[in-house]
């Protein structure tokens, strides 16, 4: 059962081939047997089985929805009632939330069964899942490699079939990059599509939740439940709720008469900036092969330009740390979170609690953010970065005049070895070159498995990035689903799984 996708598990439940409790027990045992991956930071079998029993009751009563009884793992950045919610930090090591994040609540209302909370880079700050207080996550494809970050635990859990799906968050690539490195499918929706209420904040103008699963069809099902307006999130979009599955299996034109060329009429934009120096040859080969497959499906490839791509790194690493320094000021050891055992006075308690509670990367970003927001530097750094951010968004709109979707690599390379970039944060930041601009513009983007590296990296997956215009998630999922109907990269699993 553990090899099945969400849609296949739904069919198995409907056919009475298994129960929700049996499914939950299967995944709980797999999580226990594969602890060495370090994908999970908190598992509570009692709560999981209680949820599964409730789901079985709904199924027996004929009240099951599309997701009822299906297991889900939650990134530990989403607060979850009666579960530890740590954001991968010592600061929140023992914090138990009194309420559910909107994402958690909506998936629970849909009948999904939580099998645990997944590991992550501390406060979602990282690209490798090495910054977690609970230790690094291993990539199931190659235990020496990182799984990507910051949603590395979620990606590893889905890749290793410890859960059929998981939630993630994406601030600068934290759904797409680990999905690419771990050989699964993940989508970051348009900013505001998924509520941030109960999502422990990193950078509020960038953070966005999304689903991670084996297939685009699974992601569409999850997004149906996760998305929609939430009055408790001031940045939540008021758009009418959509059915993100509505185009799956259809021709791009909608005429229904092009089964051999289902994507005839689709224009795929290829940014020349995404295919230049710095892109590894093995990644380029996998992306080129995927693009040839799209041509075989009827799509037309056109060159476009995103001229400010290189500026996305400095812009992001001004704006995101600035917002983080503000958001993380709430962790002071007074109301909740870690408090130093010994201190002289209130100020000393603040200093020691934060010094002990935050890890090195979080401290680095707080310092950078505080600096760029300080008097005398605000205009030179933060304000300038916001102006360039607007230009980056305009570049995408110009590109979309010539294409329907944009495609390219998710990352310049496959996953690197654990520890390989830990001493050089700039090298780590450069790995996000193809994802940051999408987040800065607030656009939807996704990663789809499309191949593997070469030589010593032959077991390390490569992901194809698909970028859509605002609110175009349903069409992006259609494009990804067409590729997955024609290929089997998404079906592949790590050895021993």
Curated annotation (Swiss-Prot):
The keyword Ribosomal protein does not apply. Its EC number is 6.3.5.7. Keywords: ATP-binding, Ligase, Nucleotide-binding, Protein biosynthesis. One of its GO terms (molecular function) is glutaminyl-tRNA synthase (glutamine-hydrolyzing) activity. SUPFAM superfamilies: Amidase signature (AS) enzymes. It catalyses: L-glutamyl-tRNA(Gln) + L-glutamine + ATP + H2O = L-glutaminyl-tRNA(Gln) + L-glutamate + ADP + phosphate + H(+). GO terms for cellular component: glutamyl-tRNA(Gln) amidotransferase complex. One of its GO terms (biological process) is translation. It comes from the Bacteria. The active site is at 75 (charge relay system), 150 (charge relay system), 174 (acyl-ester intermediate). It is an enzyme of class 6 (ligase). Heterotrimer of A, B and C subunits. HAMAP family: GatA (MF_00120). PANTHER family: GLUTAMYL-TRNA(GLN) AMIDOTRANSFERASE SUBUNIT A (PTHR11895:SF151), TRANSAMIDASE (PTHR11895). Allows the formation of correctly charged Gln-tRNA(Gln) through the transamidation of misacylated Glu-tRNA(Gln) in organisms which lack glutaminyl-tRNA synthetase. The reaction takes place in the presence of glutamine and ATP through an activated gamma-phospho-Glu-tRNA(Gln). Belongs to the amidase family. GatA subfamily. This is Glutamyl-tRNA(Gln) amidotransferase subunit A. It comes from Paraburkholderia phymatum (strain DSM 17167 / CIP 108236 / LMG 21445 / STM815). The lineage of its organism: Bacteria, Pseudomonadati, Pseudomonadota, Betaproteobacteria, Burkholderiales. The gene is gatA.
């Amino acid at each position: 059962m553990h090899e099945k996708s969400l849609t296949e598990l739904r069919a198995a439940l409907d056919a009475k081939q298994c129960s929700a409790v049996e499914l939950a027990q299967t995944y709980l045992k797999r999580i226990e047997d594969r602890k060495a991956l370090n994908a999970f930071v908190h598992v509570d079998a009692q709560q999981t089985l209680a949820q599964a029993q409730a789901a079985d009751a709904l199924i027996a009563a004929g009240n099951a929805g599309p997701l009822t009884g299906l297991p889900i793992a939650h990134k530990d950045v989403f607060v979850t009632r009666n579960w530890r919610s740590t954001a991968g930090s010592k600061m929140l090591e023992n914090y138990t939330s009194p309420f559910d994040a909107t994402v958690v609540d909506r998936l629970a209302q849909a009948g999904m069964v939580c099998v645990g909370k997944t590991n992550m880079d501390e406060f979602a700050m990282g690209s490798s899942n090495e910054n977690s207080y609970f230790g690094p996550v291993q990539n199931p494809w190659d235990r020496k490699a990182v799984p990507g970050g910051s949603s590395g635990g979620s990606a590893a859990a889905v890749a290793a079939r410890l859960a059929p799906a998981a939630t993630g968050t994406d601030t600068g690539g934290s759904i797409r990059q680990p999905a690419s490195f771990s050989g699964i499918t993940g989508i970051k929706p348009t900013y505001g599509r998924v509520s941030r209420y109960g999502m422990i904040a990193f950078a509020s103008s960038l953070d966005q939740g999304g689903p991670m699963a084996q297939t685009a069809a699974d992601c569409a099902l999850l997004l149906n439940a996760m998305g929609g307006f939430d009055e408790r999130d001031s940045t939540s979009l008021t758009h009418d709720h959509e059915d993100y599955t509505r185009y799956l299996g259809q021709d791009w034109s909608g005429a229904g008469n092009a089964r051999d060329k289902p994507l005839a009429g689709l224009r795929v934009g290829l940014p020349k900036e995404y295919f230049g120096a710095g892109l590894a040859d093995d990644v380029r080969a996998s992306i080129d092969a995927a693009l040839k497959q799209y041509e075989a499906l009827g799509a037309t490839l056109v060159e476009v330009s995103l001229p400010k791509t290189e500026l996305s790194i400095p812009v992001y690493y001004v704006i995101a740390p600035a917002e983080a320094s503000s958001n993380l000021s709430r962790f002071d050891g007074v109301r909740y979170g870690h408090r130093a055992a010994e201190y002289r006075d209130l100020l000393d308690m603040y200093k020691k609690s934060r010094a002990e509670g935050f890890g090195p990367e979080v401290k680095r970003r707080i310092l950078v953010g505080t600096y760029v927001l300080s008097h005398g530097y605000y205009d030179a750094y933060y304000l300038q970065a916001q102006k360039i951010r607007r230009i980056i968004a305009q570049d995408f709109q110009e590109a979309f005049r010539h294409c329907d979707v944009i495609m390219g690599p998710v990352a310049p390379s496959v996953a690197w070895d654990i520890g390989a970039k830990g001493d050089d944060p700039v090298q780590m930041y450069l790995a996000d070159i193809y994802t940051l601009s999408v987040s800065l513009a607030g656009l939807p983007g996704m990663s789809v498995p499309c191949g593997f590296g070469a030589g010593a990296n032959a077991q390390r997956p490569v992901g194809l990035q698909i970028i859509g215009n605002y609110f175009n998630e349903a069409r992006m999922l259609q494009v990804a689903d067409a590729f997955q109907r024609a290929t089997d990269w998404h079906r592949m699993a790590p050895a021993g799984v």
